[in-house]
């Protein structure tokens, strides 16, 4: 009997150990499973899903956006849809404030009503409702997707539709509808963009054929010089009128009621533009030293200590957080390499100039004057390619910053198109000024409240009498006679 007891106890102990082992193993497996599938811990799945996002790489590919969806089938994307949509809705939804959640509900309601209006044939009302929905929830993929489809099929605005599909995919990479829509529109939009660039080249060549001694062209160049400074400082908040800006540049006299800084901003731009005309336009390569010298002149009268120097503190620009001061030297070296690389110089001049502008303002290397320096660099590159310096009207400031914001979010194309628009309007102005057209060409008719820089230019050009340029004024040099 005693022997039987002894042999029984080890068996019971073995059973107990096995039970404990399987219990612990099962508990651990359950914990790992929940950890991997919970919305708060999606690192392993999220890492792979991030590879499927649409990327814009500020440190490398400035023209192309990398669409990595192209290597995955729709079936594979659908396999991730349920998991990804749930994890995104859980994690993002939890971060919404009560007001934001209310806006999203209202936006979805407006979107559904817009779809009903469209079915009823009331497209005007549908368009207004879609705009309202987008204003309430500009980051909601469903709103972006449905509005894009409405624009594509009913408004025939395939470019804007493609932009919204791109945004929807950036927010929800597993959205197979947005993916399919973008596959349909991407090539068409690229073709339209390429045709636009061909048209710009044709207008540039037509302008280049006009002799530099043409009196009308010289008047247009002089007026554009004043306009360029007026609008560039105006974008940054300078309150000088065009007449006051002209007076400061021509007389060097102070304007009553205006701050010293506002005067100095205008004088700094004048110095920088003369430096471009006298030096940079003729150079084969633009170096980091050239950019620092350009900035030194921009801030030469406002803040000579910071002029031409990298910032030494962290700055914040709206929702954009530029690199820290410790990274600026390396990033600017990379920018210099990109600026002079064979790949960059093979781009169309308008694309190249717009991307250089964006890249520099994205790095934000200076404590002040980043926007003015970036626009001056952009125009330097355009002038080297035979284009006139582009005027970005200060009345379009909100659009300008909106497109920069979209570029920060991953889609550089709207900003490049905006610069192309400004380039075309500037070219049209010069061509109009040197032609025998009795009236304004249609695309130049703008009211001042809409940013009528070209209408203002036309008025001043028409009223100006031919006059010789002063030697060394910075207005008589440049490529193909551009200021």
Curated annotation (Swiss-Prot):
ATP binds at residues 236, 317-320, 368-375, 400-401, 408. One of its GO terms (cellular component) is plasma membrane. Its EC number is 2.7.7.108, 3.1.4.-. A motif (Inhibitory (S/T)XXXE(G/N) motif) lies at residues 232-237. It catalyses: L-tyrosyl-[protein] + ATP = O-(5'-adenylyl)-L-tyrosyl-[protein] + diphosphate; L-threonyl-[protein] + ATP = 3-O-(5'-adenylyl)-L-threonyl-[protein] + diphosphate; 3-O-(5'-adenylyl)-L-threonyl-[protein] + H2O = L-threonyl-[protein] + AMP + H(+). PROSITE patterns: FIDO, TPR_REGION. TPR repeats lie at residues 107-140, 141-175. The active site is at residue 364. One of its GO terms (biological process) is response to endoplasmic reticulum stress. Homodimer. The fido domain mediates the adenylyltransferase activity. This is Protein adenylyltransferase Fic. The lineage of its organism: Eukaryota, Metazoa, Ecdysozoa, Arthropoda, Hexapoda.
């Amino acid at each position: 009997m005693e022997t039987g007891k002894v042999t029984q106890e080890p068996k019971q102990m073995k059973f107990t150990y096995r039970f404990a082992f399987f219990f612990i193993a099962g508990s651990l497996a359950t914990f790992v499973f929940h950890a991997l599938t919970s919305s708060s811990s999606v690192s392993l799945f999220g890492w792979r899903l991030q590879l499927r996002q649409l990327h814009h790489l500020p440190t490398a590919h400035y023209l192309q956006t990398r669409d990595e969806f192209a290597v995955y089938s729709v079936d594979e994307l659908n396999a991730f849809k349920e998991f990804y949509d749930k994890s995104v809705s859980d994690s993002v939804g939890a971060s919404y404030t009560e007001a934001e959640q209310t806006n999203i509900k209202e936006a979805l309601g407006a979107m559904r009503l817009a779809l009903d209006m469209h079915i009823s044939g009331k497209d005007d009302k549908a368009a207004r409702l879609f705009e309202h929905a987008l204003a309430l929830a500009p980051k909601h993929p469903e709103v972006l997707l449905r509005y894009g489809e409405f624009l594509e099929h009913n408004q025939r605005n395939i470019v804007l539709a493609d932009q919204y599909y791109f945004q929807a995919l950036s927010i929800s990479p597993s959205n197979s509808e947005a993916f399919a829509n973008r596959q349909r529109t991407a090539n068409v939009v690229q073709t339209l963009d390429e045709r636009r660039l061909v048209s710009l080249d044709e207008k540039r060549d037509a302008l280049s054929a006009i002799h530099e001694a043409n009196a009308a062209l010289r008047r247009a160049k002089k007026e554009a010089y004043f306009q360029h400074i007026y609008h560039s400082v105006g974008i940054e908040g300078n309150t000088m009128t065009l007449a006051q800006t002209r007076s400061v540049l021509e007389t060097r006299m102070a304007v009553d009621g205006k701050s010293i800084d506002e005067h100095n901003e205008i004088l700094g731009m004048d110095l920088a533009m003369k430096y471009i005309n006298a030096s940079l336009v003729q150079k084969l390569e633009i170096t980091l030293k050239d950019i620092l010298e350009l900035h030194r002149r921009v801030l030469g009268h406002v803040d000579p200590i910071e002029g031409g120097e990298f910032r030494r503190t962290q700055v914040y620009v709206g929702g954009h957080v530029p690199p820290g001061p410790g990274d600026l030297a390396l990033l600017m070296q990379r920018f210099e390499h990109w600026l002079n690389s064979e790949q960059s110089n093979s781009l169309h001049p308008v694309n190249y100039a717009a991307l250089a502008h964006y890249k520099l303002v994205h790095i934000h290397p200076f404590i002040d004057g980043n926007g003015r320096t970036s626009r001056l660099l952009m125009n330097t590159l355009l002038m080297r390619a035979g284009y006139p310096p582009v005027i970005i009207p200060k009345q379009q400031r909100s659009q300008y910053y909106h497109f920069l914001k979209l570029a920060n979010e991953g889609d550089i194309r709207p900003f490049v198109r905006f610069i192309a628009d400004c380039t075309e309007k500037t070219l049209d102005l010069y061509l109009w000024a040197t032609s025998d057209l009795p009236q304004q060409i249609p695309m130049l008719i703008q009211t001042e409240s809409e940013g009528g820089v070209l209408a203002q230019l036309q008025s001043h050009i028409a009223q100006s009498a031919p006059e010789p340029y002063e030697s060394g004024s910075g207005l008589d040099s440049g490529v193909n006679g551009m200021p």
